Amino acid sequence: MNNSIFKNPSVKPFAFKFGLVKRVIVGGPYVAKPDDYFGIKMAIEIDRPCDVDIPTKDFSVPKYEDLDNGVRASLIPIAKNKPVFVGCFGGLGRTGLLMGALAKALNIPEPVLYVRANFKSHAIETDQQVKFIGNYTPSLKTKLMVSVAKAVALAY
């Protein structure tokens, strides 16, 4: 992982257990994403290339299917320990929302509290976003991909 990315104070790492291994992804304003990172863009208002686009208005939540597809699409790059960047305009609300959904898919207890303790204390900014994570249940496809990705992670 390119540590020069952390010269921007709005960009922070987010570490978590991924099966038997530890993984770190990066979050912040999407405009700070380095070109060589796998990009998950949560901001409908930002027009930059990305690998996964989850179009979401500021202070809002995405469509369930879009978020679930985004979580699923992020799993193999994370498993392969590729540099992954999650971002929105400010790098807090929608960015934290994706991280919370990922944590929930990985069965991390209290995903909102986990994101706030391990990424940014103000991440997941609105009550609507908190409730969305509370109500998010990964689809069967996503649950199966979590199992596959955990096995893949052991090889990397």
Regions found by a protein language model. Give the residues of each.
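Short cysteine clusters
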Residues: 88
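Conserved G/P- and acidic residue-centered "switch" motifs that form tight phosphate/ATP-binding loops
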Residues: 91
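Cys-dependent protein tyrosine phosphatase-like superfamily
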Residues: 1-85, 98-156
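Ser/Thr-glycine-rich phosphate-binding loops at phosphate-binding pockets of nucleotides
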Residues: 95
